[in-house]
Design a protein with these regions (language model features):
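Asp-based, Mg2+/Mn2+-dependent phosphohydrolase catalytic module
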Residues: 1-5, 118, 122-221
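Short, surface-exposed acidic
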Residues: 29-37, 73-83, 132, 164
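A metal-dependent, Asp-based hydrolase signature
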Residues: 46-83
């Protein structure tokens, strides 16, 4: 039985592609290109750091990834330029169905689980007016590790005092779903871009194009 819903935040509740607008302010005509490269470099950096056990706070890796992209593409930048782009992580666009779905699921506990720090998460949730829908926020920056480290999911169940199979873990990121599924959570992959789930050994329990699809799942709990 599902007792709690755990949400990833970036790409799941908020559109990470909206960063192109913040990058566009600083680099007119190049915002989309920079934002896309930044996103992939950030994911790569986090995964490599996890593999070699060299933790660095998410907020710092965020800046490192952006600076790398700008250097590689020969863009000049100042500290203010970096801050303007990074500030976009606190102002991302919320996906259109999120507020309605969270309100409808008001009778089940919901938690945010993210690599970011609490300040970044709080600011993002408040600007979208959805901060009151969550029972708790578990920011991994305070624990010195990233998803998809198996120990991060142990922290989650210890904090929430639930069993693995009582958690419904929701993410749009495939690597996040694979790790959570292998740990023992029930998982729902939000396939917003209609892509293939190529990890044949591990499959999510549920797959939907948006959060609306989870309505039928929760009816059964």
């Amino acid at each position: 039985m599902i007792k709690i819903i755990v949400f990833d935040i970036y790409g799941t509740l908020f559109d990470i592609n909206s960063l192109r607008e913040d990058c566009e302010k600083v680099y007119p005509g190049n915002g989309e290109k920079i934002a896309k490269a930044w996103k992939y470099k950030l994911i790569e950096n986090i995964h490599v750091r996890q593999l070699v056990d060299q933790y660095k706070p998410f907020s710092s890796v965020l800046c490192d990834a952006l600076e790398y992209v700008l250097d590689r593409k020969d863009f000049d930048y100042t500290v203010k330029d970096i801050q303007t782009c990074v500030k976009g992580y606190e102002q991302l666009e919320i996906f259109p169905e999120v507020q309605h779905v969270l309100k409808e699921w008001n009778d089940i506990d919901k938690v945010i689980f993210s690599n970011a720090n609490k300040q970044m998460i709080d600011a993002l949730l408040k600007q979208a007016a959805i901060d009151t829908y969550f029972k708790d926020i578990i920011p991994l920056e305070g624990y010195g590790m990233y998803k998809a480290n198996g120990n991060s999911y142990k922290i989650l169940i210890e904090q929430l005092n639930v069993k693995k199979d009582e958690v419904l873990f929701i993410s749009t990121n495939k690597w996040d779903i694979v790790s959570a599924q292998k740990f023992g959570f029930q998982t729902a992959w939000i396939n917003r871009h209609l892509s293939e789930f190529e990890y044949l050994e591990v499959q999510p329990n549920y797959e939907f194009q948006s959060l609306y699809g989870l309505k039928e799942v929760l009816k059964k709990t």
